Amino acid sequence: MKKSKTYYLFSPDQGLSKIAVIFVFTLVLWSCANDEQGYTPLNIITAADTGEVYQNAVLTLDILENDTNVPIDGQIILDSPLKGTASISPYNNLAEAKLTYTPNTGAIGEDTFIYSVCDQFGEQCSNSIITINILPISPVTLDLSNVPYPVLSDYNFFEGNMADQIPSFGVLPYQPISVLFSDYAKKKRFVWMPQGTSANYVSDGELLNFPTGAVLIKTFFYDNVLPDLNRQIIETRLLIKKEEGWFFADYIWDAAQQEAYLDVNGYGANVPLEWVENGQTNFVNYRIPSTSQCYTCHKSYQEETPIGPKPQNLNGSFDYMDGVENQLQKWINTGYLTASLPSQINTVVDWSDENQDLELRVRSYFDINCASCHSDSGHCDYRALRMDFSSTDDLANIGVCVDPDTPIPGYESAKLIEPGNAQASVLFFRLHTTDEEYRMPLLGRSLRHDESIIFIQEWIENLITVCD
């Protein structure tokens, strides 16, 4: 390391001869030259950097944050990017320098250029590549003072034929690992957030803290609907985050599958249809819920809330247009989630996956289908059951050996779950029946979910707990 030196130069009137002055000055020059020859530069190590920016925005990037041995009195050199302009902010200490990048008008896609970090003498340098992805401006239109709009197309969530459900730029598809049963309706889910905003992690089993302006989009449909075996989209539900909280808006699709119209009165509707699945013809009188029915399940301490987008439900892979990726990581990469997640997340399993542990499948099924009501803040908060995934490691919270609150004819002395005997278990009866008075869940289904009945019955039959 270069040592600090102080040199003194005396003048003749201080008593030294001109020869002495020349000698001292020569000594100073020799000393400085000799000092530079003994200088050992640091081994500067730079690393590649990446960033994303919208066409109409400016990106600030700390390109030195992941570099090593950056000299405080060094220098930084930028090559000229092709699709934008780049500059370095003023600094006192080189480590404080930031890159500012502005895309050219109309430019999109990837822009790469090189930056170099050198010491003050230019003797030691290192360079790396900066890659900037320029994103087009999202076409989504959302004015919180004017929503809900009268028709779904006003939002521009989808490009091309809206029935194809091809998301516009910035509209990100997602799917919970374990999905809600809704009379065998299929679903497509999407999330959109305003530019520059993101959700925050709260806990594994709690809803992400979404920013104002975020929208959750959920479309319900059936394939192979008779008589023409076509896809029929029934409704698209929006959950919009306003300053005062979440807001529901339901859009009912027309018969031509060209547009969806706001359910202005919030009454909902019944849609009878037949569809073919696995070679079997099925009938459902599908219920588009009223606003009050939506609120029954989508509430927490009397406030409207989404159900599914929790880290425990999103910590799995999804097949995006550009490849398979973990959903939480995709949200982070998109800018929709801050990168502040714990290293381990208590994650549900896909209840339909027969390769998973049977008890985990049961707990995951109850979490997505029942926990929104059976929680401290839900519609059934007065009940003993607590069916969220993190609570059901205690099987009493599912109902094992628990007495029912409401008597049911024929089950007067039964437990909610009688270990080893599904047919004698009240909870199994509620899942099995389609009687509106007794079925569980109360809303969202009119048909029996045969696939869940099979593995839940197997789980109950294999329980060996002895009730008091």
What are these regions (language model features)?
Residues 104-108:
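Short, surface-exposed loop/turn segments at beta-strand-coil junctions that are enriched for proline
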Residues 33-70, 119-139:
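Extracellular interdomain linkers/hinges and stalk-like, low-complexity segments
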Residues 58-102:
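Surface-exposed or secretory-pathway low-complexity segments enriched in glycine-proline
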Residues 32, 207, 225-468:
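Sequence context surrounding c-type heme c attachment/ligation sites in exported
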Residues 1-41, 467-468:
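Bacterial Sec-dependent N-terminal signal peptides
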Residues 109-121:
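A short beta-strand micro-motif common to beta-rich folds, especially ectodomain repeats
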